[in-house]
Swiss-Prot record:
This protein's name: Heme exporter protein B
Pfam families: CcmB (PF03379)
Membrane topology annotation: Multi-pass membrane protein
Encoding gene, per UniProt annotation: cycW
Organism encoding this protein: Bradyrhizobium diazoefficiens (strain JCM 10833 / BCRC 13528 / IAM 13628 / NBRC 14792 / USDA 110)
Lineage: Bacteria, Pseudomonadati, Pseudomonadota, Alphaproteobacteria, Hyphomicrobiales
Family, as annotated: Belongs to the CcmB/CycW/HelB family.
Length: 222
């Protein structure tokens, strides 16, 4: 347990450094959301309807932007080999690294959502709903993206391959995240059904992601 907590703290410190990746994802998310009102124009009703989709799409793209560094930096400096050979099960190490990535790169997006919701003409209830769906759904983006990052870690131009692998897995999360948010804003669909599916997707990814990523790393590093 001590080794896993040390790994989480280490990855968070690395991610929060300049060039570590977390800041890049947050700045990209802010840029996407801030520019969208200028692209949509003065129609505030349209902007509020598109608001949840804009926030979710920004979060998805920001997540993809930072996931390629999840294992790449460790592979480059040799620490990934040490993690693989340590007594700690590789599946738990992968889960710890994904959790650290979410805390450093995913959680700040959720914290920024209430402020950015004002730019998209969302009221407090709608903004809270979007933040809640991001809290429930962004772990799925991280843990499914971890599989693609593990597959691409030993490949040339692996970032492009990771995006191709991860995007299809992320589409259901995007669909149900936006659907749950839209249910609060426009109805008449119930918020509970898509939100429950979104939570289920995150739970499934929490279980499958570490095992699939560990298997990919073992195969790629052999």
């Amino acid at each position: 347990m001590t080794a896993l907590s040390a790994l989480i703290r280490r990855d968070i410190r690395i991610a929060l450094r300049v060039g570590g990746g977390a800041l890049i994802g947050v700045l990209f998310f802010l840029t996407v959301v801030v520019l969208m009102p200028f692209a949509v124009g003065p129609d505030l009703a349209l902007l509020s309807r598109l608001g949840p989709a804009i926030l979710w799409l920004g979060a998805l793209l920001a997540s993809l932007l930072t996931l390629d560094r999840l294992f790449m930096a460790d592979h480059e400096d040799g620490s990934l080999d040490l993690i693989t050979m340590s007594r700690t099960p590789l599946e738990l190490a992968c889960a710890a690294k994904a959790l650290a990535h979410w805390l450093a790169a995913g959680l700040p997006l959720i914290v920024a959502t209430p402020v950015l919701g004002l730019l998209l003409n969302l009221d407090m209830v709608a903004t809270g709903a979007v933040a809640l769906t991001l809290l429930a759904g962004t772990p799925a983006l991280t843990f499914t993206g971890m599989i693609g990052a593990a597959l691409a870690v030993t490949l040339h131009r692996g970032g492009l391959l990771m995006a191709v692998l991860v995007l299809p897995l992320s589409i259901p999360v995007l669909i149900f995240g936006v659907a749950a948010s839209q249910a609060v804003i426009v109805g008449p669909m119930s918020f509970g059904a898509p939100f429950s599916i979104l939570c289920a997707l995150s739970l499934v990814s929490l279980v499958i992601g570490p095992f699939a990523a560990a298997a990919s790393l073992r195969h790629g590093l052999d």
